[in-house]
Amino acid sequence: MDTPFAKTPSNLLIAGVDEAGRGPLAGPVITAAVILNPEIIIEGLADSKKLSLKKREELYEKIITNCKAFAIARADVEEIDRLNIFRATLLAMQRAINQLSIQPDKVLIDGHCCPDLPYETQAIVQGDQNVPAISAASILAKVTRDREMLKYDAQYPDYGFAIHKGYGTKAHLAAIHRFGITPVHRKSFEPVRQLKLFIPEE
């Protein structure tokens, strides 16, 4: 079956872009941009959400070792609260693409919307499942964000960030109600926005 990206010339430098962390109640949104090396096939690339932790870590190392270029960027909690998650995500995508050591000929982005870029850009729904460069970007973003949440777990051990990665699970919501919110919680998100208790920054 023909896809919108099937006819992209093979000699073009294609950057795949994806994010991790749009939905959680805490932590940054992380984005990654990857230009794969067409001469080195990385087996097993897929949507990061469908891969095991071990497989993601393995592929992370293969991607950063064998790709032509990659960059990882972020929008912090403060930017998410100030801009909203949609705009903050687009900003983080811009940052990742601008940080690439090689300028791409075309940028393929997972989802429906594209940031403003000086390159030919295309949004592809389910691109993380169908476009290897986007799959690679999704893996880099997911692994990077999960590692970040482990650091938060050590800093705020009562919240279980290592387990739920900031998503609004029952355990996470219970911890928020019991202990209040931390500086890494998104104050513009429900139900965080409804709470008045804050844990002061140290």
UniProtKB/Swiss-Prot annotation:
Keywords: Cytoplasm, Endonuclease, Hydrolase, Manganese, Metal-binding, Nuclease. Its cofactor is Mn(2+); Mg(2+). A divalent metal cation binds at D18, E19, D110. Manganese or magnesium. Binds 1 divalent metal ion per monomer in the absence of substrate. May bind a second metal ion after substrate binding. Pfam families: RNase_HII. It is found in: Cytoplasm. One of its GO terms (molecular function) is RNA-DNA hybrid ribonuclease activity. It catalyses: Endonucleolytic cleavage to 5'-phosphomonoester. Residues 12-201 form the RNase H type-2 domain. NCBIfam families: PRK00015.1-1, PRK00015.1-3, PRK00015.1-4. This is Ribonuclease HII. It comes from Coxiella burnetii (strain CbuG_Q212) (Coxiella burnetii (strain Q212)). The gene is rnhB.
